[in-house]
Amino acid sequence: MSWFIQTCRSSLGKKYIMALTGFMLGAFLLVHTIGNSTIFWGRDAFNAYAHHLHALGIFVPIFEIGLYSLFFLHVITGLLLWQQNKTARGGKYAVETSAGGSTFASKTMPYTGIAIFVFILIHLVNFHFPEKTAEKTISDFVTEVLGNPLFTLIYGAGITLLFIHISHGFWSLLQTFGISHPRYDY
């Protein structure tokens, strides 16, 4: 077991953890987006989808705990890698130049990550924590929240930042697992 812990503490091990947790969070996000797209089929379809999810009973909180754990592990590992990279550099460089491999997405990963965390909190406050009743369905919450121009702007910005974060994260995942390698380029 010590080799496993030693690997997880290494820089490469942390990158594996980031890639795996990011992949699993991305898979959840894909399923969540597909499910939420039922709103385009009408209020009844969306409310039926939400009712189906809540009918899963005890599996819902178990799944949520797993999801929160993945998210927590992803965030903590990301912060550790960010700090480790900062420490390895030994401070700011005298001349700010791009090494050729950095992109806007790669340079802003910690910041987009923090913004996404805030966005997720806003999302949970708006849609997860409010009590759903027979008088007020989930589609009513969506209409109410996204009917507010401020929240529409917040959601648009949050999704944009999420896309930027995931675009670099997906590329990093391919790099970490050796899938994006000159040997495989055509």
Where are these regions (language model features)?
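Membrane-embedded alpha-helical bundles that constitute the cytochrome b-like, heme-associated redox core
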Residues: 1-186
